């Protein structure tokens, strides 16, 4: 049994932000922090007070996280970025919105007294005495304190207040992981109701000390327990009233927290086997669970259910059969060929998810070079005469501005060149298209041709394929390359217009250049010769694409499996330390890294024949490094065991917080099942004769901070998690259980009356009855897990805090 938490985050837009630049504008971006740890940075939107981001993220976290905060920043090229304001959502607030938090929220000022993080290790006890008892507080150590000084560290000390007395620890210089091991005694009066207050501070020689956090302990509860020891989370100081600083603007967010208790695999086997049996039966037998699931799934959660089902069947090797069943169901209720797969049905949503899960690398290979060219050229492109702005295009010759006709002709030439290059890339891609996608399109093509065999519908099988390949895959990726991981930043206005016109042309080709699509925007006429040629090319491509037999499919799949693509790759800066000499950022060397399911390798270039490998099975942790260690906040460490079992560390520098977290996520997910994973680590480096983080002199000393192996970002190429997918399906079915029971009663009544439901030759209620029994068994299994001693164990440390 494992408890898992995930956050679905959509950062939509901001409005009415204050101007931070002398031009009266700002260059805003967002930083997302979980428990004050940066995990996401959005793109910067330049010169605006009402930025639109539209960025989506899925973050997997341990269930013990407390807050997620959104900081709106103003990017500055020459000085430190300005903080505009923040929105903070607690875990409890998110849990109170099961369907997710959505809407506009006012930004508030960032108060230093609320910017706290970390934990403090205390041992508290009541010591009996002859005349009076004493309250003893041992301040042992702290970890992950907020860095308050410019050097990326703090100089922490602790104040302990009780019963009118204040005592202090010594100051530990330049450490966010201090160890004090100091004990303080206070007289304990009978019936005392005052709390014991433990405050952490950053000592400053010149300016005021900075607040690092506090813990307030309920002494009455401590008297009952007599003694407690553990790590207490530092809390912000909210005793001072917040001073308003005018309107800081608003942020539109969509955030959903999902907590799941994932049971052992054996618990989900009956559910998975039942669903797989239904897919194998198809539309021939009495199994009708998939249609019932579709009917009871609301539009708002259809995409999520489709993705989960698709991943579940992909893991069982039945994705093609599942999609084929959905194709047949959709065709069975479609009478008009021109409406086929145009709705947001389960079939359409499942096919969308399938292409993203199985075909993203294929998409990148086709679109990547063309999208890069459009971004790099930054040409002004416009075909609509009503939108042409001659001033935007400069001059074609000396002292003579371009005419509108010249602008339109030049734009048409640019778009034709991009379209020809794109069609050429598509037509050459038959052999690089994943075999499972080709086989699925083959089934779709055949099913549609069987359903609409007349000559007047000869284009319908092609349009069925292009409705997914072009309209729901290529065109959206061209329109929004960042959402498909083709670019790190959104396009500017000029590039966006070029991409929009190119996407429209691809849609026209995907629609097989129908008169309706031509009539909508007559100004697209200059592209018509290329579009007509593209239709012929695309038809030829589709015929080759679907011309795949089962043996060829298996051979291609085996070849693909034997040449597993990298999980992640790209250039990074490396520093390998043997504990000799000083460590500095200048000692980093740029190399090309590649992470596969077998190893992390690095070489001078991506094409180098000689590489160095770190076996994936030998990785023990992948963690961030303190900013003060190298003067950069974008450095991670990979701790691994060498051939003789000794711990070694390699330090890698990334270019930004997003790249850092993407590499950390990839490494953590790839090594999640490794033996010997570390539970603690040193976020600093061993410089000279001690660790820079906690100042301990033993190089083999246990780490001073917890590892974060469960903090990961969801990516399109994540490995399938069969148990989690089964749990998500169970959770959805549990939510529609009442509708399933109602459907079961109707089917049972019809069978008893001797009326067989349309399309069912057997007893469809048997499948539903099995499903309802499986749901009941899983409900009982979850109930047993919640009733276990570990689940019921009280959180003493939380109860002690006031």
Swiss-Prot record:
Record keywords, A-Z: Calcium, Cell membrane, Cytoplasm, GTPase activation, Membrane, Metal-binding, Repeat, Zinc, Zinc-finger
Binding residues annotated for Ca(2+) 3, in chain numbering: 76, 79, 82
One Gene Ontology cellular component annotation held by this UniProt entry: cytosol
Compartments reported by the entry: Cytoplasm, Cytosol; Cell membrane
Binding-site residues, Ca(2+) 5: 149, 202, 204, 210
SUPFAM superfamilies: C2 domain (Calcium/lipid-binding domain, CaLB), GTPase activation domain, GAP, PH domain-like
Xref: InterPro entries: C2_dom, C2_domain_sf, PH-like_dom_sf, PH_domain, Ras_GTPase, RASA4_PH, RasGAP_CS, RasGAP_dom
GO molecular function, one term: phospholipid binding
Residues involved in Ca(2+) 2 binding: 21, 74, 76, 82
Residues reported in the UniProt entry to bind Ca(2+) 1: 21, 27, 74, 76
UniProt site positions, description: Arginine finger: 342
Residues that hold Ca(2+) 4 according to the record: 149, 155, 202, 204
Residues annotated to bind Zn(2+): 682, 693-694, 704
Ranges for domain Ras-GAP: 317-545
Binding of Ca(2+) 6, residues: 204, 207, 210
Zinc finger motifs (Btk-type), residue ranges: 674-710
Superkingdom of origin: Eukaryota
Domain C2: 1-105, 116-232
Sequence ranges assigned to domain PH in this UniProt record: 565-672
Membrane topology, from the record: Peripheral membrane protein
Tissue-level expression: Isoform 2 is expressed in osteoblasts.
Protein name: Ras GTPase-activating protein 4
């Amino acid at each position: 049994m494992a408890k898992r938490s995930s956050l679905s985050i959509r950062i939509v837009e901001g409005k009415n932000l204050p101007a931070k630049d002398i031009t009266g504008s700002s260059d805003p971006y967002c930083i997302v922090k979980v428990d004050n740890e940066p995990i996401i940075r959005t793109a910067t939107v330049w010169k605006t007070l009402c930025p639109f981001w539209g960025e989506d993220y899925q973050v997997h976290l341990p269930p013990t996280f407390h807050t997620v905060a959104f900081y709106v920043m103003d990017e500055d090229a020459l000085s430190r970025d300005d903080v505009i304001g923040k929105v903070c959502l607690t875990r409890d607030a998110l849990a109170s919105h099961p369907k997710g938090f959505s809407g506009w929220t006012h930004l508030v000022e960032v108060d230093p007294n609320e910017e706290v993080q970390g934990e403090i290790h205390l041992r508290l006890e009541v010591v009996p005495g002859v005349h009076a008892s004493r309250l003893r507080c041992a301040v042992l150590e702290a970890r992950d304190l907020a860095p308050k000084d410019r050097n990326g560290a703090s100089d922490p000390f602790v104040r302990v207040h009780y019963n009118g007395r204040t005592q202090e620890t010594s100051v530990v210089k330049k450490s966010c992981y201090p160890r004090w091991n100091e004990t303080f005694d206070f007289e304990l009066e009978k019936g005392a109701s005052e709390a014991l207050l433990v405050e952490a501070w950053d000592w400053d020689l010149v300016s005021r000390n900075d607040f690092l956090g506090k813990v307030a302990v309920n002494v009455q509860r401590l008297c009952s327990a007599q003694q407690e020891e553990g790590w207490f989370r530092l809390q912000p100081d909210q005793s001072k009233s917040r001073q308003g600083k005018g309107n800081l603007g608003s942020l539109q967010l969509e955030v959903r927290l999902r907590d799941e208790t994932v049971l052992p695999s054996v618990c989900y086997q009956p559910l998975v086997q039942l669903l797989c049996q239904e897919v194998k039966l198809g539309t021939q037998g009495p199994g009708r669970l998939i249609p019932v699931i579709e009917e009871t799934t609301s539009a708002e959660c259809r995409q999520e259910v489709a993705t989960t089902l698709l991943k579940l069947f992909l893991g069982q090797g039945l994705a093609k059969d599942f999609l084929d069943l959905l194709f047949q169901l959709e065709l069975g209720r479609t009478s008009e060929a021109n409406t086929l797969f145009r709705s947001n049905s389960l079939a359409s949503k499942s096919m969308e998810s399938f292409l993203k899960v199985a075909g993203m690398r294929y998409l990148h290979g086709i679109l990547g070079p063309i999208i890069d060219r459009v971004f790099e050229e930054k040409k002004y492109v416009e075909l609509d005469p009503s939108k042409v702005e001659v001033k935007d295009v400069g001059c074609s010759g000396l002292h003579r501005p371009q005419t509108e006709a010249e602008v339109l002709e030049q734009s048409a030439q640019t778009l034709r060149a991009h379209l020809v290059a794109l069609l050429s890339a598509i037509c050459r891609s038959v052999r690089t298209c994943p075999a499972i996608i080709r086989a699925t399109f083959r089934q779709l093509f055949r099913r549609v041709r069987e359903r609409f065999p007349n000559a007047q519908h000869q284009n319908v099988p092609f349009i069925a394929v292009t409705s997914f390949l072009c309209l729901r895959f290529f065109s959206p990726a061209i329109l929004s390359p960042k959402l498909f991981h083709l670019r790190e930043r959104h396009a500017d206005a000029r590039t966006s217009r070029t991409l929009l016109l190119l996407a429209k042309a691809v849609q026209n080709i995907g629609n097989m250049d129908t008169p309706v699509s031509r009539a909508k925007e007559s100004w697209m006429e200059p592209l018509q010769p290329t579009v007509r040629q593209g239709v012929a090319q695309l038809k030829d491509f589709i015929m080759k694409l679907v011309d795949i037999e089962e043996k060829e499919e298996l051979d291609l799949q085996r070849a693909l499996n034997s040449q597993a693509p990298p999980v992640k790759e790209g250039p990074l800066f490396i520093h390998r330390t043997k504990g000799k000499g000083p460590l500095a950022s200048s000692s980093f060397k740029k190399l090309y890294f590649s992470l596969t399911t077998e190893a992390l390798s690095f070489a001078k270039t991506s094409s180098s024949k000689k590489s160095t490998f770190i076996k994936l099975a030998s990785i023990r942790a992948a963690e961030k490094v303190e900013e003060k260690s190298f003067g950069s906040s974008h450095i991670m460490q990979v701790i691994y065991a060498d051939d003789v079992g000794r711990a070694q560390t390699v330090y890698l520098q990334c270019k930004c917080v997003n790249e850092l977290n993407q590499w950390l996520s990839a490494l953590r997910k790839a090594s999640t099942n490794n033996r010997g994973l570390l539970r603690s680590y040193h976020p600093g480096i061993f410089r000279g004769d001690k660790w820079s983080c906690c100042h301990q002199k033993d190089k083999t000393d246990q780490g001073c901070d917890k590892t974060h192996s469960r903090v990961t970002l969801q990516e399109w190429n994540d490995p399938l998690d069969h148990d989690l997918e089964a749990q998500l399906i169970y959770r959805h079915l549990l939510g529609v259980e009442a509708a399933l029971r109602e459907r079961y009663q109707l089917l049972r009544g019809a069978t008893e009356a001797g009326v067989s439901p349309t399309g069912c030759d057997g007893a469809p209620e048997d499948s539903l009855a099995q499903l309802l029994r499986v749901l009941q068994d899983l409900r009982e299994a979850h109930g047993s897990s919640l009733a276990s001693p570990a689940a019921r164990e009280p959180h003493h440390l939380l109860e002690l805090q006031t």
